[in-house]
Amino acid sequence: HLGKIKGVKVAYVGDGNNVTNSLFVAGAILGANVTCFSPENCSPDAAVFIKANEIAKKNGCTLAVENDISKLKDFDVIYTDTWVSMGDNTPLDTVRKKYMPYQINQNLVDQSGAQIVMHCLPAHRGYEITDEVMDGPKSVVFDEAENRLHIHMAVLAKLINA
């Protein structure tokens, strides 16, 4: 969609979880500038961040963690994930209060300047992302899911034929 990865500005918005950790490593390797916007005490794994930052410096890109969602400006891509990971028994009201300022809605997309919105699914519509954005023209959520299907099939084929 953007024609390149090197130099692209990616904002991950939400819980600093395994997806964020993987995005930091992949971004560092591919030369993307990745910033994680998450609430206090919900940042990605510090050890992963430090290691990915070493890679990023070698590849001329930057990684950052930010709690202030008002700083989400001038990004190319917004990426999010579910607010509640498997096995997390935190009450939904507690989760909602903590993460609602980080909801991917049209105002946040407009503020960010992003041309692409991603979500790795499953999505909880009305929580981490609104219907308007998920079904909107900047969303590549379902393309992303289709691509993941093909990747999974290729890995399975390789493993079966190994």
Where do the protein language model's features map onto the residues?
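Alpha-helical scaffold segments in soluble metabolic enzymes
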Residues: S22, A26-I29, K51, Q111, ...
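Conserved active-site and cofactor/substrate-binding residues in soluble primary-metabolism enzymes
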Residues: N18, S22, A47, Q103-I104, ...
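C-terminal helix-to-coil terminal segments
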Residues: D135-A162
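Generic beta-sheet signal
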Residues: F37, M118-C120, E144
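Hydrophobic/aromatic residues located in beta-strands of well-ordered beta-sheets
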Residues: V10, V34, V117-M118, V155
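Rossmann-like adenosine-cofactor binding region
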Residues: E54-E132, K138
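Glycine-rich phosphate/diphosphate-binding loop of Rossmann-like nucleotide-binding domains
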Residues: L2-T80
